[in-house]
From Swiss-Prot:
Molecular function in Gene Ontology: acyltransferase activity, transferring groups other than amino-acyl groups; lyase activity
Provenance organism: Cannabis sativa (Hemp)
Record SUPFAM superfamilies: Thiolase-like
BP terms from Gene Ontology: cannabinoid biosynthetic process; polyketide biosynthetic process; terpenoid biosynthetic process
Lineage, opening ranks: Eukaryota, Viridiplantae, Streptophyta, Embryophyta, Tracheophyta
Protein name from the UniProt record: 3,5,7-trioxododecanoyl-CoA synthase
Summary of the function given for this chain in its UniProt record: Involved in the biosynthesis of cannabinoids-related terpenophenolic natural products, which have pharmacological activity. Polyketide synthase responsible for olivetol biosynthesis, from a C(12)-polyketide, probably 3,5,7-trioxododecanoyl-CoA. Catalyzes the first step in the cannabinoids biosynthetic pathway. The preferred substrate is hexanoyl-CoA, but also accepts CoA esters with C4 to C8 aliphatic side chains.
E.C. designation(s): 2.3.1.206, 4.4.1.-
Domain of life: Eukaryota
Amino acid sequence: MNHLRAEGPASVLAIGTANPENILLQDEFPDYYFRVTKSEHMTQLKEKFRKICDKSMIRKRNCFLNEEHLKQNPRLVEHEMQTLDARQDMLVVEVPKLGKDACAKAIKEWGQPKSKITHLIFTSASTTDMPGADYHCAKLLGLSPSVKRVMMYQLGCYGGGTVLRIAKDIAENNKGARVLAVCCDIMACLFRGPSESDLELLVGQAIFGDGAAAVIVGAEPDESVGERPIFELVSTGQTILPNSEGTIGGHIREAGLIFDLHKDVPMLISNNIEKCLIEAFTPIGISDWNSIFWITHPGGKAILDKVEEKLHLKSDKFVDSRHVLSEHGNMSSSTVLFVMDELRKRSLEEGKSTTGDGFEWGVLFGFGPGLTVERVVVRSVPIKY
């Protein structure tokens, strides 16, 4: 049966990203948010929100939901109005469309006919429908009706790591497989007006943005037709952090997606991340966390700061995560793939010897509901100039 399996590890062969055109500038967002939600009378809460935005280290975000949508659906700005139908009517259309845009960019970079795509993985926490976003994305792209699809709903911010793990398993166990893995989230699912009794809501309104990312994963790249690996996916793992139940969560209610984010999340991640690293890198003989490159989901500034401090990391280890957070906010599952894309582009622009900032080995981390940690040990490839 070995002839049915690929030889060697799976690699990321192409990356594509996409965002809605509408841009929200963070320094203007408190005024915008309280104006469109008709909450300008809540002056003290607005000042609290302004401080949250100022501390977020986010410069701008992309957002599908604009004022025209809010005028057409005025109930969306109410704090607890029954608006799930209106939200889903938008998102079941827009999530596959934005995902398709990211896929098209990945396929273009890959340079191969889309008929070679054998599997499609799609994850989103923004919407749920049957047939799913995977089906609609495949139709929009014109993929083969026999493409093997996997749809994963409600993973949240660790989903970028999950799609890589599953894509790796598929590619390595099906010789010749080329897996298109897509993450897309649009935060119209959780946009709503402020409440004095719901400060967690304000954090979500301050940090989340819309985005989609797609990767093509395959083993045994065929260089004769121009396939080039960007990163090798060496090993994967997932764990639930101890004493973390209820710290990150999302609940679909009549008012939309209600998001939970506990203040202890940065501490929980920073206190447990080294154990994840030791388990991942002991077989390779690596114990210096400054000797690897980092592709880290930037759930928020505090998470990056706490991990950096706990592991005594150099300040440049999270430069790509901080850049993506600044330019796009937290886009849930796709964010870590934006970071991967930024790392390989910056490595090329700065003349580094590898796609991993000049380092051979690296790690990708996703953090999300559970509190779940998804990690991938990644190996860079040399850059040929």
